Amino acid sequence: MTILGIQLKALSRASLIHKKKVMVLDDWGPFDDGFEEASLTKGSEDEVQFWLAEELQKQNKVKILDSISLEELGRIIFQERQDVNKPSSLVKLPKDFYFKVSALIKDLKMRKDLESLEQLKKASQLINEIISIRTRKIIELAFLGITDQEILDRLTAEEILVYKNIKYIIEHSIGDIIGNTAN
């Protein structure tokens, strides 16, 4: 596994402990995870760690609220296409965008009806196009050596890792090719 792969895996695991907003569909708890005790009351909104929210959603105890929809993916792809060849035109995404996308795909795969299958196909197409456009823009940013924080703030945590790794490779490979390491 590459360093980037390890970094992305660590980021993915760390996101499991981030809190997510949920709508409580049925009373649940108390539950002590060693750090805090949680009890959820039907009809309320609460925040729980994502790994717990996912498990409780499978049991129909909660519904995760801060998820991403097909409509939102459509809006993002529309905006990304506006200036597809301009790397500084990256749309600002939530830092946990790819985590939300992963949760959407997981949720659609769990459902076994025809409509969900069609939504899964549509979501996959949108996500692949978003990734393709954004990756192209990120490579251009790294190649041009762009360090404008306003632009970099539009990247997700995963994209920041990709950007930094590509930038490092470009800077150091060019130096190696001509016989000295660039800084």
Q: Where do the language-model regions lie?
A:
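Compact, well-ordered interaction domains used in eukaryotic information-processing assemblies
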Residues: 27-70
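Short N-terminal secondary-structure initiator segments
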Residues: 16-18, 42, 49, 86-89
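N-terminal, Lys/Arg-enriched amphipathic/low-complexity engagement segments
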Residues: 1-33
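Charge/polar-rich, low-complexity and marginally structured segments
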Residues: 2-12, 69-183
